[in-house]
């Protein structure tokens, strides 16, 4: 199993907006093990989307189909201005032992 963290460092005042958008997206994706988290300690204005997959291959397959359903496409429209809401981002992939 792997756990993936997609991390966004948001501009001040935007973390809750970004988290809300991702939460709405997480509610419509077929994968049900998606968590949207905001910082309580550490770097400020951080939003982390955490998800788990059986393998790296399963993650790659999931990325291929992301945003394909009509419901996802509708929610993804709200992301069109997201690039203006964050400063940087990164992805971390962890193997669970």
Question: Which sequence ranges carry the predicted segments?
Answer:
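A broad, low-specificity signal marking well-ordered, structured residues that form hydrophobic/aromatic
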Residues: 4, 47, 89
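Short hydrophobic/aromatic beta-strand micro-patches
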Residues: 9, 50-52
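Short, surface-exposed ligand-recognition loops at beta-strand->loop->(often short) alpha-helix junctions
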Residues: 9-19
């Amino acid at each position: 199993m792997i756990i993936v963290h997609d991390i966004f460092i948001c501009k001040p005042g935007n973390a809750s907006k970004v988290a809300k958008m991702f939460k709405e997206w997480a509610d419509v994706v077929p994968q049900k093990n998606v968590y949207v988290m905001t910082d309580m300690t550490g770097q400020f204005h951080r939003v982390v989307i955490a998800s788990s997959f059986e393998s790296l291959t399963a993650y790659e397959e999931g990325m291929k189909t992301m945003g394909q359903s009509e419901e996802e496409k509708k929610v993804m429209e709200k992301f069109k201005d997201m690039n203006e809401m964050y400063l940087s981002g990164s992805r971390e992939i962890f193997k669970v032992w």
